[in-house]
């Protein structure tokens, strides 16, 4: 047998004479003749080969291992005690374990040839480049070799020594590998020093893939470093491709890092792209936009224009379901996109999963949009959706409520959720869902009375729903309070106006008042409680203290006032969301005149006189409708 050092000398001499060094494919050493007693060239030469081969063969998979047998692999790996062969054998074994061709514990561990291969690797690791060390460690851990074993610790110690001279991409590879393997003190030390090296060398961040991986590992870095990472993304965004920008946005969405300047930069450069992403990529971008609560109108329009021509080509119902979920959750009202998704669903209604059908109904209701094929679409959907289709009662309630919003609900569907057996199950529902469930039941109950005249089934006992309170956000209250302050110049409280009304129909009304046919304010208390009554009737009080239902005198108008904020409108339009459209329709059916104050018309910074005149004009306008 030729001594190891003589083999090494021979390789070096052949390299000097112009012989081609062994080729490197990914993390696997490919040797033309396993029987040849060859050895690795100098580390510098090998690193160059790694970089060149990675560029030429990026994405190349390992050789097909399906035809290889374990004894053959182990025999080749230990031939001539060549550590090139040993490393190749290690990677091949790792692939075989990953593809479940062999079981490491059962078929490999303890095998004499395997132990011999490990011994060769253990002795040779000190001569390995960072790329080779990292590949060996990844394969060892993938095989299931104990983290406390000598060979694993030898490779990790070699990586620890190489951290300072390692390339930045290799540092990130060490980071991602060790995050998942923190079983020993040495592994923890490698991770700690790797993080310190990355933070110290942050100026070397250049690739979009590197930044994406760093974002996914954000919990391990300081806030200062993450700020620098954000800066690098914004600095390099204009050099990135559309897919790279999309992946970075998705990474931010996954970790829910709402770094607004970064998201804006990514959205800006994505919207400028002339090429198109695939439907799956666009679905991922939509999901990220939804998670980040960043419905940038320009980016959304780009997504819609990219997606609409490709919808018909989608064969994966789950992808369509995911897109529908995002549209509904964002309340994004894009008629073109909703139309093609509705057509896609109609053509496949008999084969679509029930989740897709319910997602479409919920999305259309959320956006307050009626598709042009509604007359043919909804019968196909409702024929497949029934209470037994859902394991959770709340899911069926969502469907019935959505059909109510869309004006497509049937008496049987309403009866199924207003039945005492269904209503009595509300206390069993999760606490955070109860308010929403009760509000939807109130909406449905009101629709049964006011919109569905043929309904004769059970109704809610409103006395059990007196504690249902709708709360507004701080920004919403700010606009509403400003409007009320201006309105008091026309309608002094409490004689002429009720404010902040929690109705019996599950709708919050900012104000209620009464006027004559000319718009002159009348004392609202003279005409009973109106919407203030949880019974929903116009209730007055007798001198004895008992209540009495009062009929509205002729010529008197009851007026309900809504202050609409940004969140009350569907994204991408000045159309109210479905729930608000339903509230408006229910109030109209109750005989109310409606004053609607949208945020984009009302100027909080405007002069008081002008605002009062604006409100007065809106009141008079409502009386002639």
Can you say where each PLM-predicted feature lies in the sequence?
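Eukaryotic RNA-binding helical-repeat scaffolds
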Residues: 2-625
């Amino acid at each position: 047998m030729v001594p190891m050092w003589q083999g090494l000398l021979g390789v070096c001499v052949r390299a000097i004479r112009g012989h081609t060094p062994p080729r490197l494919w990914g993390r696997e050493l490919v040797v033309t003749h396993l029987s040849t007693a060859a050895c690795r060239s100098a580390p510098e030469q090998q690193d160059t080969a790694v970089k060149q081969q990675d560029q030429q063969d990026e994405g190349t998979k390992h050789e097909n291992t399906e035809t290889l047998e374990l004894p053959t692999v182990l025999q080749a790996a230990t031939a001539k005690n060549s550590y090139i062969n040993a490393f190749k054998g290690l990677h091949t074994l790792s692939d075989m374990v990953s593809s479940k061709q062999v079981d490491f514990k059962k078929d490999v561990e303890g095998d004499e040839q395997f132990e011999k291969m490990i011994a060769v690797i253990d002795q040779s690791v000190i001569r390995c480049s960072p790329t080779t060390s990292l590949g060996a460690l990844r394969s060892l851990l993938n095989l299931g070799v104990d983290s406390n074993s000598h060979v694993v610790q030898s490779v990790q110690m070699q990586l620890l020594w190489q951290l300072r001279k390692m390339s930045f991409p290799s540092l990130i590879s060490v980071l991602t590998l060790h995050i998942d393997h923190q079983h020993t003190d040495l592994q923890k030390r490698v991770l700690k020093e790797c993080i310190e090296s990355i933070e110290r060398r942050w100026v070397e961040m250049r690739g979009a893939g590197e930044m994406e991986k760093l974002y996914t590992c954000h919990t391990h870095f300081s806030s200062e470093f993450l700020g620098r990472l954000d800066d690098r993304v914004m600095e390099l965004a204009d050099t990135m491709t559309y897919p790279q920008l999309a992946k970075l946005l998705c990474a931010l969405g996954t970790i829910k890092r709402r770094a607004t300047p970064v998201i804006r930069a990514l959205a800006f450069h994505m919207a400028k792209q002339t090429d198109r992403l695939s439907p799956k990529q666009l679905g991922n971008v939509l999901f990220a936009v939804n998670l980040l609560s960043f419905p940038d109108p320009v980016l959304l329009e780009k997504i819609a224009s990219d997606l609409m021509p490709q919808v018909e080509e989608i064969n994966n119902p789950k992808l369509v379901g995911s897109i529908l979920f995002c549209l509904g959750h964002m309340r994004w009202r894009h008629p073109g996109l909703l139309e093609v998704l509705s057509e896609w669903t109609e053509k496949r209604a008999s084969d679509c999963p029930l989740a897709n059908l319910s997602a479409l109904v919920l999305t259309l209701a959320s956006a307050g949009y009626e598709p042009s094929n509604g007359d043919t679409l909804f019968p196909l959907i409702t024929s497949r959706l029934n209470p037994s289709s859902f394991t959770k009662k709340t899911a069926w309630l969502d469907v019935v409520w959505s059909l109510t919003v869309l004006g497509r609900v049937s008496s049987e569907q309403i009866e199924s959720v207003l039945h005492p057996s269904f209503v009595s199950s509300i206390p069993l529902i999760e606490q955070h869902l109860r308010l929403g469930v009760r509000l939807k039941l109130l909406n449905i109950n009101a629709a049964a009375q006011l919109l569905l005249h043929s309904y004769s089934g059970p109704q809610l006992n409103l006395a059990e729903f007196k504690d249902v309170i709708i709360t507004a956000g701080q920004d919403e209250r700010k606009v509403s309070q400003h409007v009320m302050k201006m309105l008091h110049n026309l309608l002094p409280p409490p004689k002429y106006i009720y404010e902040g009304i929690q109705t019996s129909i599950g709708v919050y009304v900012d104000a209620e008042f009464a006027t004559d046919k000319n718009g002159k304010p009348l004392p609202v208390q003279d005409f009973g409680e109106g919407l203030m009554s949880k019974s929903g009737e116009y209730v007055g009080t007798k001198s004895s203290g008992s209540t009495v239902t009062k009929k509205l005198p002729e010529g008197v108008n009851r007026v309900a006032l809504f202050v609409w904020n940004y969140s009350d409108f569907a994204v991408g339009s000045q159309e109210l969301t479905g729930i608000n459209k339903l509230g408006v329709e229910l109030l109209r059916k109750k005989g109310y005149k409606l004053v609607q104050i949208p945020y984009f018309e009302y100027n909080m910074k405007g002069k008081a006189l002008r605002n009062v005149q604006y409100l007065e004009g809106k009141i008079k306008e409502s009386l002639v409708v």
